[in-house]
Structure formats: C-alpha cells, structure tokens
Amino acid sequence: MNTSLENLTHKMQRAALGKIVDVALSHAEHDREKTMCQLVDVAKQFYGSGFSDETYENAKKVLTDPDSKWTKLINCVLDQTNPHVARTTALNLGYEAFFRGTKMIRENRVKYQCNIPWLILFDPTSACNMHSVGCWAGEYGNKNNLSFEDMDKIVTQGKELGVYLYMLTGGEPLVRKKDVLKLAEKHNDVEFAIYTNSTLIDEPFCEEVQRLGNIAFMLSIEGTPETNDARRGEGHYAAVMHAMDLLKKYGILFGTSICYTRQNIDAVTNDEFMRFLCEKGAHFGFYFHYMPVGNEAAPELMPTPEQRKYMIDRIRYLRSSACDIPFYPMDFQNDGEFVGGCIAGGRNYFHINSAGDAEPCVFIHYSNANIHDQSILEILHSPLFMAYHNGQPFNKNHLRPCPMLENPELLEKMVHETGAHSTDLQSPESVEHLCEKCKAYAADWQPTADEIWSHHKVRESRYENYKDWKPSQPLD
C-alpha cells in the first residue's frame, strides 16, 4: 500500500512540476526575469530547508540582474537548448536526481549503512576508435562489452536506491549508440551524460537524442588544434568542431571534458579558448588532472605543484563574477572542498568497467565485485567499497583528497587489506607500481596544498556523507 501511494505521489509531483516548467519556459521568450523568479520559487518549494532562505533570496537577486554573469550564462543555455530537451532535463536532473533521488539516497545510506552514490558511471564498451597518448582506455581493445541487459540492470537497480544520473565513458560509448539510445528511451525518467571523443556524432543520431531529450554530452578537447591533436591524433579537433555544430543545431546540451597535463594547461584555460567554447555552444565543462594509471602511463604529464596551484586559482576566477565569460568549469581534483573530499567508492559515485568490474573510481582499477553476479547494493557492500566508506575523508585537506594521487599509502593499504584484484583489461598493474608513481608527486604537492588550505576558511556543510558525520547543530 505504501509503495502504491509513494508511486502515485511521485507521478503527481512530476506531472505538477512538468506543468510549472512548461509555463516557465513559455515565459522565457519574452520575460526572462519572471522565469528566473519562478524557477527559484519552484526550487524552494521542492528543496525547502535544504538551502537557507538567504540562499533563495540571493539567487533571485543574482538571476534577475541582467548584468549578472549567471543571468548571461543561463540565457545562453536557454537560447540554445531545444524546449523538449530543457523540459526533460529539468524533470530528470532537477526533480528526479536532485530532489527525489537525493532524499532516497540519504535515507538508504542510513538504512543500508554503506555509501549510496548520487551517480553511477559505466562503460558500455572497451572499444575505442582512437589511441590518445597516456590514455589507458585506448589500450583495452574491443573485447569487452556490457550487454544491454547489463546496462539495464545497472540503471534499474540504481533507481531503486535513488540514483537518477548515469554517466557513460569507455572506450568510446557511441560505438554502442543503438543500445545507448534504447537504454535512454526505456529509462526516460533519468538523465544520461556521455563522455565522448565526438567522432561518431552525426545528424541521424542527433535527431534521436533531441527526440528523447534525456542525454547530454561532454566532448573531449584539449585547447588548440595543435595541442589537441598532438595527444588525441590528427583530425580529432575537426571532428569535435563538427560535433559541436551539430549538437548546437539540434539544441542538445553539451559541455567539455578536458584532461589537463604539464604540457597543455595554458592552452585549455586561457580566455581565448574559453570564449571560443562559448561561441561553439559549450557553457560548462569538467577538468580532469592527468592520472598516471596503467603500466604504459606517462607520469611526466602530471602537472607541477606550481601548475596545479595555477589551476586552482584559474578555475575559481573563471567561475567568479569578476569573469564575464559565460562558462562554468568544474575541476574533479581541485574542487574537493565543495564535495567533502574524495567522492569515490560510492560516496557520490563509482565506476563499472566494460567487463562488469565495479571500481571505486574511474581511475582506481581494483575491485572485489562484478555486476554480472552481484547487485548494485552488494557491490556497495563489497570489501573495497566499504574500506572507502569507512576511511573517507582520506585527508582533512580537501586539496589532497585522493587515496591514490595525494595519499598513495592509503590506496595500497586498502587494496591489500581487502584482497582487491587489478581490473586493468590489457596489462594488470600492481597497486605498488601505481602508487610508487604517485609518491614523489604527493610529497611535492603537500607543502603547496597545505599552505593554500591553511589560509582557507572551511565552511561546514549542511549535510556530509561520512560514516560518522553529524552536524554541529541540528539542521532546519
């Protein structure tokens, strides 16, 4: 009875929100200020005390200021996005993932006493049509694939726990584009985001993505044609440009996925490049610190401490109101303060590779569990995942969040204690070999990281997913 009532309430809430979004989008053409106020009011109605009253009022103030960077950014996205895509994203990402999913996840973390993620990343295939320098995935070949049934199992079981955001990587996920579209159509209440090299995005595919409305893209790009093609191969930059033009034409949401290395940091962060991305239609992006994963990795590509400090300062500037570029960058390694440190091991996300192995992180190729013979919940209770759950945060300085890159002794200890095995599909790498490559880097980075953190005002989170975390005062 309770389940039936919950399902009815869910359907009614989604339908009601859908009507509100329709009205807001209809106003967007001629009254953006009214649209912004409506969206904040809707957020307050659904999220309530998840944010303070001051936060909601400040949001209204900023979003109704025509000169605000955030107003300009949202206007760019609204102008560019197909209405059906915008509506579906608002419902799937805004309502299902952020509102309803978050509530379910927090309840299930208490119920099951383990990490429950906010998103799941999985690889439909190990196949890739490129061979980027320093990329482990390009070495895997095409021998492993998750079946449609495997992917359906991941999403179905994830939804039962409250997970409504799924990211796909590989390999190249669009090698399996037919199954990806089939999956998105079956699970039309979740949001899918695909990391892609762009080469397989074509017009017929974009037509289907627009029809479905629940797929976004992160396109791999690394600066100029020269810096990009030097690592990713001749002709790749042109393929990305073509894909951007198609996605913009069809009003499909897309951003960028950028791996920054010792060799390309200026090329992927300078004003000219950022403005160019906006002109092409990308207004958000993920930056990833190069990781020396795999026996064939190139540790010399890891940034210097000075370069990493520059990235911290640069990304924060690009996000600030002092910068007029309508682009929102996120840095997977340097934004730990906003997510409480390491998010892997299911704390906020985990990864399933194309052989079905469940890994704590896309960069941590060790596991005790496989989706072929275990459920998502069993995976989250597996020894290595529970070691993450019991050990997070791995460092109180969230500029040193990772148990591999900045605290390599911790990953080595967890792998040994849990008996996790290497999941590298081509050339299994011992945890000693991996962590040895990180020790000098960790030692070099620590003084700079600690100096930055010592002058940083740490804000207490209203909610934190650590094993024994409790707020210093009751939440509203």
Where are these regions (language model features)?
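Radical SAM enzyme [4Fe-4S]-AdoMet core and its adjacent flexible, acidic
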Residues: 1-57, 61, 229-345, 353-355, ...
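Short loop/turn microsegments at loop-to-beta-strand junctions
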Residues: 120, 346-348
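Flexible mid-to-C-terminal extensions adjoining Fe-S/redox cofactors in radical SAM and related proteins
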Residues: 4-12, 16, 20-23, 27, ...
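Short, charged low-complexity linear segments at domain edges
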Residues: 96-117, 329-332, 336, 370-387
